[in-house]
């Protein structure tokens, strides 16, 4: 009642002015999205005064996304660009220098510059390139990764000669004798990623991880999978040493002296261990771990290893959520970490002695990339939502008011009309509660009937929620005039491990029923025209579109991006073979009934809905032959269909001009069938 009375007292001219201001804002289309600065990798200086971070922008004319490094005071102030063509800023221990990676010379190499960007100096000039740089804690050495030939190691003359033979040889055949031989968009080849070290002043590099294994792991590895001890004597890293990496998620942690020497395995878990971080006092090693071998979507726990005794503790064993990023408190007494929950991601903390894990910061957003200031008073992190891209924030380490340190996208956002996500819940399969989110069109009128677009996420162990995406941006689709619905069916993360595991061996079962329950809900909304609905998805979402093709005609149009059409053929074409083995209880010859039950290709005679099929020729996760099979089946049955294949894209469409083309054709296709 009080709210209604307050609204009634607002003068009519002010209401008209507010409406006019909203009307002046432009719809947030894909061209507006291309104007945004993409912020990431914030790094707090050791003296706690500055934050360095990466910014990626879009150059449509050159069809590139160049990267720059910026700095901003932790106390607040205007961010300042200090380097072009630069990525991965890492501070020196005395906060006077920043190491970074740049390909300004043609190949990625390690550089160092002053903290204000002055005096850039190239440190490495390796034929195999360099990346992932870290400063040693005494400031004397740099640790980085390079893809070297195992028999050459850090001998660059040897590596250069072998690269010349590869480049100039008349025969380009790939000879493969084992698995895993390619990943995402990259063929494995003969080279391996190794950790190398070099003096900060330059000089000869030393190979710290010799041999025929990748560090970090070629698959399921990343730039956070190695760390240097506070006393500077050793490096901890993750490595998969199993005989057949293609069927194994088993990365263990190893330590090696920073001067080189034999490595020692410090974890024996049969599943994944990664993201090691030493405590500031050097007493502990914290890391993330899963416990079920072969299950890449098992729960990520926060583990604590006492280095002197070998005592191992799962700090978050009672927390039925995944631990994402984490950071140590300066006195080594507790750890801050981020946890995904029901479409959001919060910051929590826990003592090294275990116990409760209170929430420090939450809200309708996704918080990540947390770091704590050296005095323990402040923390920095990235913050994003479904209506605002990533910016860097600070807050008191105990929680409280948030302050934005960056505002790089304010001008673009203020000129366009974006819509906040609206949460809803429905009863799905077996009466499980299923969450979804809605995004309404700009200038929404409740008495109008809108077409609806159902977006189905990939994974299947993924989620929709308060995060910003450039590849499936709900704001762009809403600006095209759709009520956009984003369900989180069975298999989605953030609802407990059982909810995730319910997708295993049941790809077209409960998840499909959950999506149909959301479809029923959306179709009955008073402002939705239930006869003008479309659905789209990528990866597993594309699989679900292919499944929908054979099981319902509720939708007027479909878009299948990188979708799995035939489970049997896809299982031996994909690279991460542990995935089908876990999801379907083995390979097709082990469990043929499971593959036959859930393969969309076996329901091809029911296909009727107009479908746009999109694939990338460089997609090694769901090879584009899956899309060719689907399109052929649609065409032979005279189902209206179109095939788009990007020869220069993989599982995702990443190049700016390709992205513009993708969005235009996507929106035009569904519009042809939902706006007649």
Regions found by a protein language model. Give the residues of each.
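The serine-hydrolase catalytic nucleophile loop
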Residues: 449, 460-474, 489, 625-626
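A flexible loop/linker signature enriched in serine peptidases of the S9 family
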Residues: 55-68, 81-88, 99-111, 119, ...
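Short loop/turn segments that connect beta-strands within beta-propeller blades
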Residues: 73-77, 114-118, 199-203, 257-261, ...
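Non-catalytic accessory segments flanking enzyme active sites
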Residues: 43, 143-145, 171-177, 181-211, ...
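Active-site-proximal cap/loop segments of hydrolase catalytic domains
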Residues: 473, 478-480, 486-676
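Short beta-strand element of the alpha/beta-hydrolase
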Residues: 440, 448-458
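Beta-strand-rich domains and repeat architectures in extracellular enzymes and scaffolds
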Residues: 31-67, 190
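Blade-terminus and WD-like Trp-Asp/Gly-His loop motifs, strongest in beta-propeller folds
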Residues: 43-50, 89-97, 133-141, 226-234, ...
């Amino acid at each position: 009642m009080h709210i209604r009375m307050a609204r009634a007292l607002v003068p009519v001219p002010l209401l008209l002015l507010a409406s006019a201001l909203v009307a002046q804002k432009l719809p947030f289309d894909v061209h507006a999205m291309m104007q945004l600065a993409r912020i990431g990798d914030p790094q707090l200086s050791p003296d706690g005064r500055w934050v360095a971070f990466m910014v990626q922008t879009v150059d449509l004319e050159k069809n590139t996304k160049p990267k720059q490094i910026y700095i901003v005071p932790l106390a607040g102030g205007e961010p300042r660009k200090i380097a072009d063509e630069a990525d991965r800023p890492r501070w020196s221990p005395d906060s006077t220098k920043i190491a970074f990676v740049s390909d300004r010379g043609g190949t990625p190499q390690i550089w160092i510059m002053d903290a204000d960007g002055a005096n850039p100096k190239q440190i490495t000039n390796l034929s195999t390139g360099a990346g992932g740089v870290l400063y040693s804690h005494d400031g004397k050495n740099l640790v980085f990764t390079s893809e070297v030939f195992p028999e050459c190691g850090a001998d660059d003359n040897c590596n250069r000669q072998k690269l010349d033979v590869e480049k100039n040889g008349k025969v380009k055949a790939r000879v493969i004798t084992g698995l895993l031989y390619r990943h995402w968009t990259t063929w494995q080849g003969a080279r391996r990623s190794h950790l190398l070290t070099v003096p900060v002043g330059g000089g000869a590099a030393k190979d710290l991880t010799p041999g025929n294994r990748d560090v970090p792991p070629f698959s399921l590895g990343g730039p956070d999978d190695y760390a240097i001890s506070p006393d500077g004597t050793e490096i901890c890293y993750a490595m998969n040493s199993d005989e057949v990496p293609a069927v194994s998620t088993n990365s263990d942690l190893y330590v090696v002296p920073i001067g080189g020497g034999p490595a020692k395995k410090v974890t024996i878990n049969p599943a994944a261990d990664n993201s090691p971080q030493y405590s500031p006092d050097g007493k502990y090693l914290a890391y993330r771990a899963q416990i079920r071998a072969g299950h890449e979507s098992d729960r990520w726990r926060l583990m604590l290893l006492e280095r002197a005794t070998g005592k191992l503790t799962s700090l978050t064993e009672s927390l039925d959520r995944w631990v994402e990023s984490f950071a140590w408190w300066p006195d080594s007494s507790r750890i801050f970490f981020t946890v995904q929950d029901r479409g959001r991601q919060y910051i929590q903390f826990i003592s090294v002695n275990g116990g409760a894990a209170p929430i420090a910061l939450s809200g309708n957003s996704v918080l990540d990339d947390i770091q704590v200031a050296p005095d323990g008073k402040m923390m920095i992190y990235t913050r994003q939502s479904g209506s605002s891209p990533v910016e860097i924030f600070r807050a008191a380490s105990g929680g409280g008011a948030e302050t934005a340190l960056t505002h790089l996208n304010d001008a673009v956002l203020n000129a366009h009309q974006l819509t906040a996500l609206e949460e809803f819940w429905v009863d799905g399969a077996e009466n499980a509660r299923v969450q979804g989110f809605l995004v309404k069109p700009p200038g929404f009128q409740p008495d109008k009937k809108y077409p609806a677009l159902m977006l189905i996420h990939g994974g299947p162990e993924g989620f929709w929620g308060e995060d910003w995406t450039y590849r499936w941006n709900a704001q762009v689709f809403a600006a095209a005039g759709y009520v956009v619905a984003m369900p989180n069916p069975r298999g989605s993360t953030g609802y407990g491990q059982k909810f995730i595991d319910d997708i295993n061996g049941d790809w077209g079962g409960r998840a499909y029923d959950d999506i149909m329950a959301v479809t029923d809900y959306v179709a009955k909304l008073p402002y939705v025209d239930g006869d003008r609905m479309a659905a789209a998805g990528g990866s597993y979402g594309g699989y679900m579109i292919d499944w929908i093709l054979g099981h319902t005609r509720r939708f007027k149009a479909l878009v299948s991006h990188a979708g799995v059409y035939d489970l049997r053929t896809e299982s031996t074409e994909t690279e991460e073979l542990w995935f089908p083995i876990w999801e379907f209880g083995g390979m097709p010859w082990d469990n043929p009934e499971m593959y036959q039950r859930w393969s969309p290709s076996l329901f091809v005679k029911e296909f009727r809905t107009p479908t746009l099929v999109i694939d990338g020729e460089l997609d090694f996760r769901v090879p584009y032959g899956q899309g060719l099979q689907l399109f052929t089946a649609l065409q032979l049955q005279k189902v209206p269909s179109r095939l788009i294949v990007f020869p220069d894209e993989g599982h995702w469409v990443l190049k700016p001009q390709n992205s513009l083309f993708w969005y235009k054709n996507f929106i035009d296709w569904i519009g042809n069938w939902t706006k007649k």
